[in-house]
Amino acid sequence: MLKAGINTPQPATPVYRAGRFYQLEMPFIEGATAYDLLKSELPVSQDLLYELARGLGKIVGRIARAGLRHRDLKLENVVVKASSQEATPLSLWLIDPVGIRSSYSLTDSLVCMLDRLAIQPLNDGLAVPLSLQIICIQSALGQLSGIQRRHFFQLLRKSLLDSRFRAHQI
């Protein structure tokens, strides 16, 4: 994760071991989760939300470009660390690196993680503005080639149709 340029707490100490599995204690990262900022009823500046969407997209893009995929990326697992100066960019921390797996397809990885980010607000009835969704997707895509971009949007469209179909079945 560090090689990919993603802020994530480093495990402090092993707490428990069961066979080949370890439970590690992670340091506490102070701040609000991305989800808390989106659902906050307090007035939050649009610039802050745009920067948050851009930062989330960068995290998704960096994970995917590193040949990885976070199989359970949620807005609750990204902490926005408070900054003392207004001019400094937001510091986003991925606090749940447990779901990281290898991925052989950049576009599959991007779609999977963006889809996972969208599920929680949808399930809670939180309307995320389209502008924030677009900023997040653009930031995640970065400099993809035209062919990869086309493939990405085909997969994303299929994913959206599948999720709508599943929602109607319930």
PLM ranges: what are they?
Residues 1-34, 61-66, 170:
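Conserved ATP-binding subdomain of kinase catalytic cores across diverse folds
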Residues 2-8, 37-71, 76:
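Conserved kinase catalytic-core helix
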Residues 17, 34, 79-84, 103-105:
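Active-site-proximal flexible loops/turns
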Residues 28-44, 99-100:
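A glycine-centered beta->alpha junction motif in the catalytic cores
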Residues 77-94:
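Conserved protein kinase catalytic/activation segment
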Residues 90-166:
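C-lobe/activation-segment region of protein kinase-like
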